[in-house]
């Protein structure tokens, strides 16, 4: 598979990571985040989570500290929108997105437009409605709904990054342990499948839906 790299070590990159819930960013693009930190010297992250009770907020902050060195954090914010009820607070959500717009990110990670979870879909829609001239990648979250699509952009991940991502997720998000799908084999399997699809030399990859790109 042909590769096209548009980022260099000397690049300056302002990244925004958007998640409806406190583990979404890590599951969807945690490996890519770790790879960007390794490969891009001047990368900064805006880490935005839209919901979480006090326990989940503590998990989100601990996770942010694990994934991001302090000097790479431009903005970190956890909102308190009610989980699964985002659609009923659309005006407040939209107002907050207008605030985020002023951060002018170069690259945005957000939810998949066709995600079966209603909170995820709304966050994806508002991302596209707000950021009309930015590079947006939609990540995927495995779940009971069976809504994984056919992604078209892949980031190859070394085994060390794969293991680090999985360890962080399982060690930090203790509140999710009762979910049967929240296991190492789930997270590793989806990375392995995407690695097969993109002929990854390391066997693993994260995958994204890229709807618009200008070369």
Feature-to-residue mapping (PLM):
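Active-site beta-strand->loop->alpha-helix modules in alpha/beta enzyme cores, enriched
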Residues: 1-143, 149, 186, 190-199, ...
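Helix-loop "lid/cap" segments that line or gate small-molecule binding pockets
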Residues: 63-68, 156, 168-175, 190
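Short polar/acidic secondary-structure junctions
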Residues: 143-144, 213
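Short, amphipathic C-terminal "tail helix"
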Residues: 202-215
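Alpha-helix N-cap and coil->helix boundary residues
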Residues: 182, 199-203
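Short, well-structured alpha-helical patches and their helix-loop capping segments
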Residues: 112-119, 157, 161, 179
């Amino acid at each position: 598979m042909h590769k096209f790299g548009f980022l260099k070590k000397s690049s300056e990159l302002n990244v925004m990571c958007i998640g409806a819930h406190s583990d979404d960013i890590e599951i969807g693009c945690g490996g890519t985040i770790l790879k960007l930190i390794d490969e891009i010297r001047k990368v900064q992250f805006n880490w935005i989570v839209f919901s979480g009770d006090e326990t989940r907020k503590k998990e989100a902050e601990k996770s942010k500290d694990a994934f991001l060195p302090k000097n790479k954090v431009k903005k970190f914010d956890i909102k308190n929108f009610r989980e699964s009820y985002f659609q009923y607070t659309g005006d407040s959500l939209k107002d907050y997105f207008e605030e985020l717009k002023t951060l002018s990110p170069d690259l945005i990670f957000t939810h998949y437009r066709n995600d079966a979870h209603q909170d995820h879909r709304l966050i994806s829609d508002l991302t596209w409605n707000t950021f009309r001239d930015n590079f947006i990648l939609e990540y995927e979250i495995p779940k009971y709904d069976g809504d994984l699509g056919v992604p078209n952009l892949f980031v190859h991940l070394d085994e060390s990054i794969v293991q680090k991502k999985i360890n962080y997720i399982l060690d930090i998000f203790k509140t999710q342990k009762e979910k049967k799908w929240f296991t190492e084999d789930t997270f590793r399997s989806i990375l392995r499948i995407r690695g097969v699809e993109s002929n990854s030399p390391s066997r693993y990859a994260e995958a994204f839906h890229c709807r618009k790109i200008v070369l």
